């Protein structure tokens, strides 16, 4: 069946028929994606434009499905922005609150995984959609404005810490959560209550969306009433895996109003449940994508640096006062090193110069321009080895397009002891992407210099000393590290010093929170808080 005929056929389906055939439709789209991957760019674009045109005649919920396919396959921001606008403009009667929330998470997750999907207006559109959803859920709960528990009634020693997902200690956001709770309790003397709202990538009421992703959820945590971390014990609650649930939200609001914490700390953002609770006590949001403001309607935020020009329209859409954004360096906590590997044990060249490329979304984050740069280096230096660690399922495709690079490639897959592996490397090399901050911090700790473009979490964590302008400069910088032992030694020392700063949560987070607490107490609006030089 030709594509045009296929689209015409499914456009005649009502919702029930569409969902009955949903698995077959997804399978057909997956096969189409494989075919498109073999075509020239011009042919691929023409077919996607045909699909986009036909989608314009479909019901809006179906149009979202087809545009999501175009977005993920094209890897261009134009389809992202069209898809977001379609969701924003969709009437509530056709695409309801739960379905729009699912779309918000699916699009946001795709953009985070593949930086090529992000356009100039993408973050602003996501913020507008998030604010729309926040207002809708507030309306459903009868909340019409902030109604804080009076300051004199709030318990100055009690803090509620909310997050949308709690997994194991290999999960960087969970480590961030526990590290911040440790500082609050051990160094600031707070009693801490952790609540997993389970709002991450909500699947409740999800509509058709291509290659739908799901969040991890550990049901066994529902049986726990406390969590232990580095010798400290924290009260713990986990919501059932049916969020957003209005009854659960009401129960959490009641808990806030009864126990009256001095404030609420939201780790991660994009959590409507936390933001609703933040209508009753002050809320401070700490994003885990720390190089940009978090998607949160909470009154206050901590950001790694000052809001940039691109952040201001996002804050405006969210209804957040830019003067209430406080600066604090984002810090990390590592899983302790348990092993001491040799290069031979890892299959790494004993006398090679090892480039480490690390991440859980490398299939989306690694693009041809990055591979071409590595291929040029492989052509110039016989002793270079490129080691991929994490998840890169398509790594073997390197051999068809980059034969020189392929001969210098090693794929380690998932590693439980990242610090032990980094100890066998020489240089951390970062592709263009949003995330990766935790892995570069681990590399710096082991004395590996980094080389990164001036964008995303890796750039924010590594700092100015390790940034390059573009991939051409990255190529020259890598060669310099290989050829200039003195330069490498100096940069390695700077890497270790930077890592010390990135591990000092007590100073960075603790001092910023302490100052922010004073601002909340006296009701000040303007925040000129900075715990480092930007």
Model-found features: residue ranges?
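N-terminal subdomain of nucleotide-sugar transferases
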Residues: 2-57, 62, 67-70, 95-219
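Active-site-proximal region of nucleotide-activated glycan assembly enzymes
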Residues: 117-128, 280-337
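Conserved catalytic-core segment of nucleotide-activated headgroup transferases in glycan assembly
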Residues: 171-183, 309, 320-405, 411
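Conserved active-site histidine-acidic residue motif and adjacent donor-binding/catalytic loop
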Residues: 242-246, 392-395, 409-422, 435-436
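Short acidic alpha-helix that forms the nucleotide-activated donor recognition element
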Residues: 250-254, 414-426, 445
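Acidic donor-binding loop of glycosyltransferase active sites
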Residues: 259-263, 423-435, 448
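Catalytic binding pocket for nucleotide-activated donors in carbohydrate/polymer assembly enzymes
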Residues: 313, 322, 431-485, 489-500
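A charged, aromatic-enriched C-terminal amphipathic alpha-helix characteristic of glycosyltransferases
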Residues: 340, 346, 483-527
């Amino acid at each position: 069946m030709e594509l045009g005929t296929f689209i015409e056929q499914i456009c005649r389906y009502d919702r029930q028929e569409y969902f009955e055939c949903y698995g077959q439709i997804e399978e057909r789209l997956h096969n189409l994606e494989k075919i498109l991957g073999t075509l020239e760019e011009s042919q691929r674009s023409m077919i996607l434009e045909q699909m986009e045109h036909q989608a314009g005649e479909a019901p809006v919920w179906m149009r979202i499905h087809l545009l999501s396919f175009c977005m993920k396959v094209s890897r261009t921001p134009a389809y992202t922005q069209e898809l977001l606008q379609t969701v924003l403009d969709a009437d509530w009667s056709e695409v309801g609150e739960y379905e729009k929330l699912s779309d918000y998470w699916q699009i946001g997750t795709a953009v985070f995984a593949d930086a090529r999907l992000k356009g100039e207006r993408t973050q602003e559109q996501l913020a507008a959609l998030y604010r729309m959803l926040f207002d809708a859920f507030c309306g459903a709960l009868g909340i019409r404005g902030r109604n804080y528990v009076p300051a004199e009634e709030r318990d100055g020693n009690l803090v509620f810490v909310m997050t949308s997902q709690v997994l194991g200690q290999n999960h960087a956001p969970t480590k961030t959560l526990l590290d911040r709770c440790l500082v609050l309790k051990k160094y600031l003397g707070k009693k801490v209550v952790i609540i997993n709202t389970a709002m991450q990538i909500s699947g409740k009421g999800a509509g058709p969306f291509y290659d739908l992703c799901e969040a991890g959820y550990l049901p066994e945590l529902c049986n726990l009433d406390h969590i232990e971390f580095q010798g400290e014990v924290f009260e713990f609650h986990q919501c059932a895996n049916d969020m957003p649930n209005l009854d659960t939200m009401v129960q959490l609001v009641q808990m806030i109003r009864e126990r009256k914490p001095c404030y609420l700390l939201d780790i991660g953002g994009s959590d409507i449940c936390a933001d609703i609770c933040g209508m009753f006590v002050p809320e401070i949001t700490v994003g885990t994508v720390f190089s940009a403001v978090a998607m949160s309607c909470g009154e206050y935020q901590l950001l790694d640096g000052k809001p940039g020009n691109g952040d201001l329209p996002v804050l405006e859409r969210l209804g957040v006062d830019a003067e209430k954004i406080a600066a604090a360096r984002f810090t990390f906590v590592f899983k302790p090193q348990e092993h001491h590997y040799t290069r031979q044990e890892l299959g790494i060249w004993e006398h090679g110069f090892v480039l480490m490329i690390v991440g859980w979304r490398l299939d989306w984050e690694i693009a041809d321009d990055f591979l071409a740069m590595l291929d040029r280096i492989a052509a110039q230096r016989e002793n270079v080895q490129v080691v991929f660690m994490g998840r890169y399922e398509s790594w073997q495709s390197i051999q068809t397009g980059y034969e020189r690079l392929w001969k210098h490639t090693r794929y380690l897959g998932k590693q439980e002891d990242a610090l032990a592996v980094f100890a066998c490397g020489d240089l951390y090399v970062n592709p263009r992407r949003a995330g990766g901050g935790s892995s570069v911090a681990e590399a710096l700790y082991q004395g590996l210099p980094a080389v990164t473009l001036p964008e995303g979490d890796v750039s924010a964590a590594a700092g100015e000393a390790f940034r390059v302008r573009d991939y051409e400069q990255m190529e020259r910088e890598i060669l310099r590290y290989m050829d200039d032992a003195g330069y490498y030694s100096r940069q390695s020392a700077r890497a270790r010093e930077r890592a010390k700063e990135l591990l000092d949560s007590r100073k960075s987070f603790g001092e910023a929170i302490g100052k922010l607490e004073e601002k909340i107490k006296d009701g000040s609006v303007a925040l000129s808080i900075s715990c480092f030089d930007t």
